[in-house]
């Protein structure tokens, strides 16, 4: 892979650090009044999700990580692994708990997800930005019960719990933003 100099660091760049693939979250170039310029970089380890803050002198370089982001279809979960399929080659990959992390609460069969692969193995899974899921359990909204914030918890078909307006009932399908976990709207059938 290519080497990236500190002047090429930007948010989202994937590099190797201490033998692990990392993604740059933040990069701040600092030029003190006296001394050599440096870059203060915040990186996320793609294997375990830990965030590191490192300082690099101006002119230092890091090796680029051989990481690919691939759109794959979620097929099923067998309890231990989540299985994904490449829609062009029909090749299947299985991701473990550490790769799926919080995305598991939004995954619905046949959804298209962004899977980050390193050496052909899934490192992380990003669900679609919006998903449509059925409410399997929520309290009934009583007429005139609007004194509070106007929301109630609802359990979705995947097990996720989101706050929904009082008028939403069990059995309805709602649209949820997976990045924030917020209710967006209800889907008419």
UniProtKB/Swiss-Prot annotation:
Chief localization: cytoplasm
PTM annotation: May be beta-lysylated on the epsilon-amino group of Lys-34 by the combined action of EpmA and EpmB, and then hydroxylated on the C5 position of the same residue by EpmC (if this protein is present). Lysylation is critical for the stimulatory effect of EF-P on peptide-bond formation. The lysylation moiety may extend toward the peptidyltransferase center and stabilize the terminal 3-CCA end of the tRNA. Hydroxylation of the C5 position on Lys-34 may allow additional potential stabilizing hydrogen-bond interactions with the P-tRNA.
Superkingdom assignment: Bacteria
InterPro entries: Elong-fact-P_C, NA-bd_OB-fold, Rib_uL2_dom2, Transl_elong_fac_P/YeiP, Transl_elong_KOW-like, Transl_elong_P/YeiP_cen, Transl_elong_P/YeiP_CS, Transl_elongation_fac_P
Cell location: Cytoplasm
Residues annotated with N6-(3,6-diaminohexanoyl)-5-hydroxylysine modification: 34
Pfam families linked to this entry: EFP (PF01132), EFP_N (PF08207), Elong-fact-P_C (PF09285)
Pathway noted in the entry: Protein biosynthesis; polypeptide chain elongation
One GO term of the biological process aspect: peptide biosynthetic process
Any one of the GO CC terms: cytoplasm
Record-linked Gene3D superfamilies: 2.30.30.30, Nucleic acid-binding proteins
Molecular-function GO term, any one: translation elongation factor activity
Keywords: Cytoplasm, Elongation factor, Hydroxylation, Protein biosynthesis
Family according to the record: Belongs to the elongation factor P family.
HAMAP family: EF_P
Summary of the function given for this chain in its UniProt record: Involved in peptide bond synthesis. Alleviates ribosome stalling that occurs when 3 or more consecutive Pro residues or the sequence PPG is present in a protein, possibly by augmenting the peptidyl transferase activity of the ribosome. Modification of Lys-34 is required for alleviation.
Name of the protein described by the UniProt record: Elongation factor P
Taxonomic source organism: Alcanivorax borkumensis (strain ATCC 700651 / DSM 11573 / NCIMB 13689 / SK2)
